[in-house]
Amino acid sequence: MTETIITVRGEHSAWFPAERATAAIGVSIDGADRATVFAQATEAAATLRESIIARHDADTGPITWWSSDGVTVTNYRPWNQEGKQLDLVYTASIGVRAKFSDFTALEQWIDEVALLPGVGISGIDWALTDATWDAVTADVRQRSVGDAVSKASTFAAAIGLSTVRAIAIADPGMLGDVSADTGGAYEPRMMSKASMDVGSASMGVSLKPEEIEVSSAVDVRFIAS
């Protein structure tokens, strides 16, 4: 009986609605006096934290988790248009992150905290819950293996063979003879795209999360006969 070794890469991607949004908020105050900018940044951050604590509940949300950095103060000496170096300017900064399960509540909160002095929105990360991630990862992995079986079967049929049997399975690159851009271990990855329109405070904030892509790949070696 004729047997042929076939080695292929199976891949699968799927898209899922975002379930969590982590907002990164920064407080930054500039001024000529170190103590003043420190006090102003601390006050703004305290108000920001109070708004988070009022919404925080690990189980029911809308904020399920949050963190806050301490105050850092840096300084620099700017130059004017005539090339003269000016007096020291101090900058007090604090970073805050808050994870939301309710995107409408997130919009309302950003609209509220944007009114605080020195507060700016650094960005928003979209994600799935851990439970959803575990479930969809398992499914995507299985489907990537199914894709490998389908490819191998097609190749086998093209050379007149009818059955394929897997003899090795591994992360991409670990079988040693599959050329691809990805080398080494390959874990399912989560990618997201979203748009964030931060207008004036009076106009409000509009968030439009897009679906999250979960992808997986696997190398499989078969004996075809």
Residue ranges of model-derived segments:
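Short, charge-dense linear interaction motifs
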Residues: M1-S225
